[in-house]
Amino acid sequence: MQVPITIGTILQNRYRLISILGQGGFCRTSMAEDTGRFNELCALKEFIPQQTNANTVAKSQELFSREAAILYKIQHPQIPKFRATFEEHQRLFLLQDYVKGKTYRIILQERQVTNSLFSEVEVLTFLRQMLSVLAYIHNLGIIHRDISPENIIRRETDKIPVLIDFGVVKEIATKVQSPDLAKPLTSVGKFCYAPWEQIQLGRATANSDLYALAVTTVVLLTGKEPQELINQAKLTWNWQQWVVVSPGFAEIINKMLSRQPSDRYQSLTEVEKALAILPRVKSQQLLTTNQQLNNFSASQEATVGANLNKILALIMAFLMIISGVQLH
């Protein structure tokens, strides 16, 4: 594997690397500043090939250009704008706008510390906002393939979710490694977030994105990882053991999480219609199970504390009486 480019390096006589934001098996993402645009920040993704022979590099270049052309078509406020691709030092780079904010994974971790998980109202808003951007890319014939809390940023300026890290680089890697195989050697999508047909068969469709979005939603609601929310023996979801939501909303999520693709919603429009008829007032009155348990625990602690104080007072009074008797 190629070593990371040194921080401070200027690529294309223009993009100065500031820091490494993250790295996966096939991609390294860095923050850079565009010296040609008043040092504007941008996200620089570097494709990390597992093989470096001439045929692999040539195939990577071809696929990279093809996928870049797809990304170039995307013009949506909830997706970082694609800027350019280039090759330097025998490395392939993809440049996009930098989005300032926190991923929903980081936000969830922060909330877990204070035990204040996402409410039904919050995830309903999140879900509706995400459906809007998914409808846009699906209409372009583009599937994200890798939806998860790590790949959605809540933009700092307006608190709107922004979809990042399309499975493009990993998709390139699978095609480069196994171009002639019906089933690629490497699947695109995270285990337990992507549905079985995507992981096992490499088949990604609109409703596989919906499946991953539903998994992300229940993770935000429960604070649990997907593998903790699945009955491994029956291969069914048991997320409702951890959180209370309105029956209508639970029905929608469960349909999105159906094991068989044919049992799921087949389009974003179907999900939007189902969400549109949910009783909003009732959903706003619901608390998550964790919140209810916290309230119950606090009440119990207060009751125990009060009873303990009464007992201590009685003991003190009893001791004083005994002391008085002994003095006489």
For each feature predicted by the language model, list its residue ranges.
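Protein kinase glycine-rich loop
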Residues: 17-25, 29
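Conserved N-lobe loop of protein kinases adjacent to the ATP-binding glycine-rich P-loop
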Residues: 33-41
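Activation-segment/catalytic-loop signature of the eukaryotic protein kinase fold
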Residues: 85
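Conserved short submotifs of the Hanks-type protein kinase catalytic core
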Residues: 89-103, 107, 111
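Activation segment signature within eukaryotic-like protein kinase domains
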Residues: 126-127
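Catalytic-loop of the protein kinase fold
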Residues: 138-155
